[in-house]
Amino acid sequence: KPFFDRAAQGRYSPASTIKPAIALYGIKEELIDWEFSIDDPGYFILPEDQRVYRGWKEGGHGTINLSQAIIQSSNTYFFSLAYKSDINKLTNHLSDYGFGRNICSDCFNPDIGLLPSPEWKMNNLNFGWFKGDTVNLGVGQGYMSATPIQLAYYSAFLANRGILNKLSFIKHENKKVDRPNSASKIQKTDWEKIHKSMIGVIEDPRGTARRLKSLKSYVVAAKSGTVELVSTETKEDYKIIRENMGNRDHAIIIAFGPMPNPKYAVSVVIENGES
């Protein structure tokens, strides 16, 4: 589809790129702090019905704190955090980061993606909201979707520590600075730690985007993600379904830099590019 505007109209699950925003929600609501650790066995069991939500790394990440959960992209950590979250507060928080709304003043017919809520699910699917829906939202999967432009906006929002002008392709002399309430409640030290953790995604030997370290000569903050198109239980199952190119996961990343004073923020989606 060469004439389809994927940047403004393509919908993709944000996947693990959402984790810095979820982390800041947990900090803001005092559900966790930076030293809060869990034992990650590679899965999370939903207490209500014993349903198992699996992480991407078999065997898990062991004992892991918030910073390393971002660097290593621990699904179990964020499953656990999302489970403790109030869905209405969480969706309001994510809306401030650009999800589920039009953030581009001069894009042609932009898609706003989907930021799911209990009200949306009842109105569109005629089902109530389950705690498992919130758990999925914690890792950017499930019903949620976003456009690459929204992801770039989100990346810039993180880079600017919650201060951002309305996205526009035309340079304006007088730009209105926007600082949503949720961002104003986040401390400077927490923004610094988010940046440090996202730098670790590339710089730390355990970072999920460590392969990019050899390709650059400056420091960049990033968060990678894998958009699952077909749900599978094991790597062996995935090897079978990936024989069809259209079943392969999308690769996704947000980034900003050069650090510590970023000038550029980007998002990249590689369809069926895998992790």
What do the PLM-derived regions correspond to, one by one?
Residues 1-16, 21-270:
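Beta-lactam-recognizing serine transpeptidase/beta-lactamase-like catalytic domain environment
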Residues 272-275:
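Short, intrinsically disordered, charge-balanced linker/junction segments flanking boundaries
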